[in-house]
Each structure stands twice: as structure tokens, then as C-alpha cells.
Amino acid sequence: MLENNNDIPCTPSKSSPSKIRKIYILRLVGRIVVLLVCAALLFLAPEQFEVLDGWGFFRSPSALHVLWVIWLIDMILQLIPAKANISLGSKKNFMAYFLPIKEKINKRALKEYILSTTRAAYKVFIIWVALTLALGTLYLFGIIPRNVLFMFTVIFYVCDLICVLIWCPFRLIMKNKCCTTCRIFNWDHIMMFSPLIFVGGFFAWSLVVMAALAWLVWEACIIIYP
């Protein structure tokens, strides 16, 4: 697997940050701005969230349409080997970014590694499903409104890059040192959009389906090309 610490956003450096890290820092700032704008809309212009109503996506333009396009493009870039400014951890499933090791493969050690990382990955999966079900239950029982449930997706959108750039709690389970070797690196969208499963409507379900597709492609590549 191709590894270059200069290209890994989560790798701290005592020298000046790499180009890709600078880009990720700017993206984090951008996502924080998105969170603040969405929070402002929640109180000042709640009608902007009508795009979440069933087929409301097609009724009138809104600020959330811009966010939908950004999210959709981001997921498409995960599905194609584009030369975009994204971490190697997100592209390592493509042949173009693969460098085979020179030593003979220890198949037993490889199998043990695959099993251990997969077990760790699905511990994370179970925890996230539990969190998603908890949020969904709060929504279904009317404790939190739909717009607030959507805001959790935006919060997760910010937390995604906090995990990459600052600190990731999932490393405690995954036991990996950096995002480049992370088994669940491209789980970001399926985790981010999981609250939208309960929202329904074209806006939410189009993102959920696309996120599920990106996740399935990632998982298939890991199984076929470990």
C-alpha cells in the first residue's frame, strides 16, 4: 500500500504542514462555517428546511440545495480514482494508488490482520448503529424535531475532519496510528448521513443511498483486494 506521511492529513509535523493538510484545515474551517450557517437558518429561516419534506427538494431552491450538491460531489469523488486533493487513505482502494510490497506475502499474517481490523471495524459499526437508533428514537417520539435531527448530520460533517486533523476516538478501537491505514476511512458519509434515514424524502434518501453505495464499494474493494 502506498504510504507517504507528507500526504497524510492526520500526521502532525513539526515543520510546515503539507499542502494536503493545509487543504484539509481550510475544509474544516469551511465545514464549521456551514454548521454556523445551518444553525442560523434553523432559527432565522426555518422555511429553508422545507427541502426535507418529501418531494420538497423540487419545489423551490434553498441554501440546503447547495449543501446537497457539495455532499453528492464529495461522494462521487470517493467512487472514482480522481486526482482530487484528498488523502491517500480515501484513495487506497484504487489500483492507481497501490504499490505492492517487495517481500513475499505472509498469508497467515495477512489473514489475521484482515480479521482483526474487520472485527474492530464492526465494533465501531455497532456503536454507530446504536447512536443512530438513539437519535431516530428521539425523533420518532417527538423529542427532537426533524430540523434538529438534520443538524446532527451537519455536526457529524464537522466532526469527520476533526477526527482526521485533530483527534479520532475511533482509533481507540481500531488501534491504527493514522488515517492512511484506517480500515474505516471511507465510512465517513454512511456515518454522517445515518440520521437522515429517519427523515425520509428525496433530499435525505438520495444522500443515504449514495453514501451506502460508496460504503459498499469500499467494503467490496477491501474484501477483494485486502
Residues covered by each model-derived region:
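Membrane-interface segments at the starts/ends of alpha-helical transmembrane spans
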Residues: S16-I23, E50-V66, I184-D188
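Short, charged cytosolic
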Residues: M1-C10, L88-N106
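Hydrophobic alpha-helical membrane-embedded segments
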Residues: R31-E47, G54-K91, L140-I143, F150-C163, ...
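Membrane-proximal helix-loop-helix units in multi-pass membrane proteins
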Residues: E112-C178
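Short membrane-interface loop/juxtamembrane segments of multi-pass integral membrane proteins
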Residues: F94-T118, C178-H189
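Select subsegments of transmembrane alpha-helices in polytopic membrane proteins
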Residues: L26-L35, T118-V129, C182-H189
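Hydrophobic alpha-helical transmembrane segments in multi-pass integral membrane proteins
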Residues: W187-A204
